[in-house]
Amino acid sequence: MDTTITTPLILILITCGANSQTVKPDTASESDQPTWSNPLFTYPEGCTLDKLSKVNASQLRCPRIFDDENRGLIAYPTSIRSLSVGNDLGDIHTQGNHIHKVLYRTICSTGFFGGQTIEKALVEMKLSTKEAGAYDTTTAAALYFPAPRCQWYTDNVQNDLIFYYTTQKSVLRDPYTRDFLDSDFIGGKCTKSPCQTHWSNVVWMGDAGIPACDSSQEIKGHLFVDKISNRVVKATSYGHHPWGLHQACMIEFCGKQWIRTDLGDLISVEYNSGAEILSFPKCEDKTVGMRGNLDDFAYLDDLVKASESREECLEAHAEIISTNSVTPYLLSKFRSPHPGINDVYAMHKGSIYHGMCMTVAVDEVSKDRTTYRAHRATSFTKWERPFGDEWEGFHGLHGNNTTIIPDLEKYVAQYKTSMMEPMSIKSVPHPSILALYNETDVSGISIRKLDSFDLQSLHWSFWPTISALGGIPFALLLAVAACCCWSGRPPTPSASQSIPMYHLANRS
């Protein structure tokens, strides 16, 4: 049969199978793409330290693996307008700061003969979102503990200073709802700045961001059609995971009609030089937002397949949790094979860091592995390393003179064993004590919660009681007793109304 007759017939059937309008691309643009494979490697770009947060091992999430098998599909060049991502994405993060309210406390306990015990503590001071912008703030470098204020034969004499200070923190912004997304927020997202975090004394404040209605852009891509069922399957463009169209529907947003894809992205698809627009039935609900970004298992369909690489990642996750340690090789299992906005991870000095950043496809790695060439780039670039040194990068990449890439190393006969060296994972510290890490006397300092009682109630003294009970003779008698019984006493414990320790590791 003449192909000039069969092709229009096949494309007309697409409308019936996918409940969309008639699709009639130019037959001259048809191209069969049987093997559109994943790139060998992906790597973050522009993922600086202020976009990362320390996380517990339980918060690691394996990447989605999208089915990029295109056998049996026909690809048609098309124009795609997306509200979320494109080839020239720009800044996907919103700049901001964590605002901390912390009481710096110095505690002095003095014995009868003048011996002193000095303690230092940080105390959470509850900070509301309304209060966050009401006071002038300083920087972490300007913080200090007050000088001790000691009294003879008195325990737990406190000298307090309250500071409001900021630390830089950028977060991802939902391009549709303009919600702020970050693991530091309660529930993983915040609707309006200032935003409350998991810590009662820390609030995030940032810019409003760019309205979604003004951020759409047109990119080039392909529309894939199943040869047998004649259904529209997906749309693709470099720099994004495939847009699944199995359960696509039409929804109104910003005064325009958009295709809501299987994972919630909003796109529009034009073909035949913009003469035709792809459409679907109306959505039954009006939900708009980046579905699935906060929970890896929030939305699963047949675009996400149970693949070998995903199983390897789940096994790596189980090993990390059971041993409370991580190696560069295990961390490499959490790298997404798809370019675009992805969860990224790094390991550094006992901590695992997480962020959501743009990743690019790597087409070529230099022979010494110190640089790479991104897809469509003409020059080589050094690997980004967020911690300011030349050792640790993202997803297990490490090394000084020779860069070790676990994804490549596992294929060679003489692999570098450094990718198997474990790092014990520390509990995630409270963010308000990070400023103290450069001090030398901070081993006993930790963050504490503030109880409801008056801070001054911890001040107590024997001296008024001594004076009232008989003056000098009683004082001498008390001195003899102190010599006999108290000279070798251990360090004075905290008062009975002690402030409970704050353990961030309990956070899920």
UniProtKB/Swiss-Prot annotation:
Predominant place of localization: virion
Top-level taxon: Viruses
Membrane-spanning parts: 462-482
Membrane topology of the entry: Single-pass type I membrane protein
Glycosylation sites: N56, N400, N401, N438
Signal peptide: 1-20
Intravirion topology ranges: 483-508
One Gene Ontology CC term in the entry: membrane
Entry's localization field: Virion membrane
UniProt keyword annotation of Transmembrane helix present: yes
Chain ranges on the Virion surface side, renumbered to this chain: 21-461
Entries under InterPro entries matching the protein: Rhabdo_glycop_CD (IPR055447), Rhabdo_glycop_FD (IPR001903), Spike_prot (IPR002417)
Key words, A-Z: Glycoprotein, Host-virus interaction, Membrane, Signal, Transmembrane, Transmembrane helix, Viral attachment to host cell, Viral envelope protein, Virion, Virus entry into host cell
Role according to the record: Binds to specific receptor at cellular surface, bringing about the attachment of the virus particle to the cell. Plays a major role in the determination of host range restriction and virulence. Class I viral fusion protein. Responsible for penetration of the viral nucleocapsid into the cell cytoplasm by mediating the fusion of the membrane of the endocytosed virus particle with the endosomal membrane. Low pH in endosomes induce an irreversible conformational change in G, releasing a fusion hydrophobic peptide.
Similarity remark: Belongs to the novirhabdovirus glycoprotein family.
Assembly description: Homotrimer.
Protein name as it appears in the record: Glycoprotein
Organism: Infectious hematopoietic necrosis virus (strain Oregon69) (IHNV)
